Amino acid sequence: MKEDILRQIGTIARALDSIANIEFKEMQLNRGQYLYLVRIKENPGIISDHLAGILNVDRTTTARSIKKLEDNGLIERKNDQRNKKIKHLFVTKKGDELAEKIEKENTYSNELVLTGLNEKKRQELAKLLQQVEDNASENWHFVKNGGKREY
């Protein structure tokens, strides 16, 4: 039996992303922007290039999302003290309150999808998925930087 694990992972990711996009729309968040807001909260002062790397998305997409979050008053940019071209990202009070709601939704969704798995299985799954994520991220960076995969 050939298992298509990537298809399963994709189905899970799309379902949860779709739910989040529906629920977060009323909070002034467009598609996927909740990811950016939470990562900025987790990494105060992060720069956009590093944020793009964490999320495995291109810089242009990141810049658009940052602009929308800033326009909605959820984040702010602050100049670097040594290099004015570098902008550090921080959540505002409004953004922090919204990020708290997003984190609650994330905890709820985690519990929901892990229903029926005991703690040992949850830890095993987390370890396996971390390896899959690391492999995917490594390949993403390789291809993004001009590498050619041989399949």
List PLM regions with ranges:
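N-terminal leader segment of winged-helix/HTH proteins
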Residues: 1-27, 74, 143, 150-151
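Short, locally clustered residues in the helix-turn-helix/winged-helix DNA-binding domain
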Residues: 10, 38-42, 103, 130
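Pre-recognition alpha-helix immediately N-terminal to the DNA-recognition helix
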Residues: 15, 19, 35-38, 97, ...
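Key DNA-contact positions within bacterial/archaeal DNA-binding proteins
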Residues: 32-34, 60
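Short capping segments at the starts of secondary-structure elements
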Residues: 43-47
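Residues within helix-turn-helix
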Residues: 48-49, 60, 67, 87
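Charged, amphipathic alpha-helical coiled-coil/dimerization segments
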Residues: 67-130
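C-terminal regulatory/oligomerization modules of transcriptional regulators
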Residues: 120-151
